[in-house]
Amino acid sequence: MPRPSRRGHAQPPKPVIIVPPFFGRRIELPVGWKIGVDIIIFGGYIRSFLQLLLGMIAFGQSGIGPDRHYNGNRFEVLNVKCLESGEYVLQNTKIYSNSLITRDVKDLKPLAGDKIVMNFKTPFTGAYMPLNLQDVIRLVRHRLIFFVNEYGSGEDIPPVDAKGNITIKEMHQHILLRRSIRSDKDFFRGWTGSIFADISKLSERARWLLSCASVVGMGPDSAFGSGFLEISNI
């Protein structure tokens, strides 16, 4: 039986999120191919990092997905780098636990600049597209609230008004065949692409939420690695 949330009635978000690379289609990776995977750990669960790392190594040895029964889909964890410290936590089979540091989202600086581009690394699975800037800020805030309530201090994150223009550079729709036990859905509809935004009129609070978006993403289905993006100035 799922454990209850600390606040509210919805099931709590996962404390560990794996954000895999998204290729937009099913592909077969040749032997020896290397890919990078982002892992985000929230709250006190950072203390379980070594168990998580050993679990990833064990998964690699046994394989993942149906093809593991045929000795397929096996992988090796070559190295792990902490993005906050910039140092390796795992390198050449050696573990450097002191290289692992954390950051509180409260310490993130508001996003600077007047114009930005948002590139979706993984599909955004919200109810509709295109979005306006108010939608973006609202979706980031909602996701952040879930994590702060469950793994943070639970402090209030007030709504923010956002005025600005958004231009869709390119957008691609994807049908993702992934099973959700919570919602009993067989598939998700998602979008990837790039969005230009004029943020010159945004408040400091709204700019801070955009900085948070680079960490926690936006929209629903965070457990599936959905809605993660990169934001850069232009």
Pin down the residues of each PLM region.
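RNA-interacting cores
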Residues: 1-234
